[in-house]
Design a protein with these regions (language model features):
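Positively charged n-region of N-terminal signal peptides that target proteins for export
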Residues: 1-5
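Short, glycine-/small- and polar/acidic-enriched structural segments
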Residues: 25-175, 191-197, 214, 221
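Short glycine-centered helix-capping/turn motifs at secondary-structure transition points
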Residues: 49, 76, 188, 207, ...
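Sec/Tat signal peptide C-region and signal peptidase I cleavage site
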Residues: 18-25
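Secondary-structure end/capping motifs
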Residues: 235-321
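Bacterial N-terminal signal peptides
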Residues: 7-17
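Pocket-lining segment of extracytoplasmic ligand-binding domains
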Residues: 179-275
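Conserved C-terminal helix/tail region of periplasmic/extracytoplasmic solute-binding proteins
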Residues: 306-350
Length: 350
């Protein structure tokens, strides 16, 4: 009886040892992420174990903006990071930051926006109700989270469509967190804001100001965020980065499917609620499909990012000191290899 009793214990011990060995053998990726639904593909892949399945241990540090992760990225504390397409990114690369963009992490695809313009109820009552009315924003205060951000780019593109000079015809209120901008709108401290869609949704529901134009209308296919890697990490650990991309792209497929029909994918909705600032699955469902769109082949929207660099160079703004080339900014081979291997190897069964 003692011998029979030892067999299960031995099996358990061997199993635990194997699991511990697997954990030790997993390749570590130190990643900066932010709690935003545009990164849904990553959150899904992480929650469903796709990175683990491909032998990766993704260790996440949370940042509220990709720009805030740059110092840790440059110092070598991080291997990869979510990275917003902002003026600071171009300046960092121009100064030698070892950053290369490898994957799409959300953009304003027509029908699947992530950003939205809200205006005060007073302005809406005066007839500012769509992009066609942006001319009435002349002389008004427009709030965005940061100077040179995707939000400022979107709002500026809308002002240009209305024939306004975005540098001179409005007063920019910058470097204010989006939740605070939402409240400032309700208090009349700003006249218009460009926010993540869920903040615009909250503002409208709280009667602080209606949504009047989404980012897919202002700047169709505008890049919201990307994944970037340190160049030295990519060179030394290319297969690790490709496997990261494979797991991520599987998550992206499920993210896009759920955005179109959230009722069909309750588990995905719960994952997104728990991983983001939204927290409430009902809100996640309510704002669908306005979660952003990520390309299922992983390709970043190169033309959009290069357009942003041109925009911040002039003639209206001069936030980028020196332009960088497409070759300096991107390594598109990672997405290509990851998609090819995902289709060929089918590690997730589909």
């Amino acid at each position: 009886m003692k011998i029979l009793g030892a067999v299960p214990a031995l099996a358990i011990g061997i199993g635990a040892a194997l699991l511990a060995n697997d954990a030790r053998c997993a390749d570590v990726v130190r990643l900066a992420e932010g709690p935003f639904i545009s990164g849904g593909g990553f959150f899904i892949a992480q929650a469903l174990g796709y990175f683990n399945k491909l032998g990766l241990d993704v260790q996440v540090r949370e940042f509220q903006d990709g720009a805030l992760a740059v110092p840790s990225f440059v110092s070598g504390e991080l291997d990869m990071s979510f990275m917003t397409a902002n003026a600071g990114l171009f300046n960092s690369v121009a100064k030698g930051a070892p950053i290369v963009i490898i994957l799409d992490r959300g953009h304003n695809r027509p029908g699947r926006p992530y950003t939205v313009i809200n205006v005060t109820q007073a302005l809406a009552d005066q007839g500012v109700r769509s992009l066609a009315d942006f001319g009435k924003l002349k002389g008004k205060r427009v709030g965005v989270g940061a100077l040179g951000s995707i939000n400022q780019f979107n709002a500026a593109k809308g002002l240009l469509k209305a024939g306004l000079d975005p540098a001179k015809d409005v007063q920019w209120i910058v470097n204010v967190p989006q939740p605070d901008l939402m409240k400032m709108l309700g208090q009349g401290q700003v006249d218009a804001t460009d926010l993540a869609y869920h903040f615009g949704f909250f503002a409208q529901n709280n009667k602080w100001g209606p949504m009047i134009a989404t980012g897919d209308v202002l700047a169709p296919n505008g890049q919201i965020a990307t994944f970037a890697a340190r160049r030295d990490f990519l060179v030394k650990n290319r297969d690790v980065v490709v496997r990261f991309a494979m797991a991520y792209l599987q998550g992206v497929k499920e993210f896009n499917a759920a955005a179109e029909n959230p009722a069909k994918y309750p588990r995905i909705v719960d994952i997104l609620a728990n991983a983001t600032t939204l927290k409430n699955p009902d809100v996640v469902r309510a704002i669908a499909p306005n979660w952003s769109y990520s390309n299922e082949d992983g390709m970043p929207v190169v033309d959009s990012i290069m357009e942003m660099q041109d925009f911040w160079t002039g003639p209206y703004f001069h936030l980028v000191e020196k332009k960088v080339t497409q070759e300096e900014l991107f390594d598109l081979s990672i997405a290509k290899e990851a998609k090819a291997r995902l289709d060929r190897e089918k590690p997730f069964g589909n």
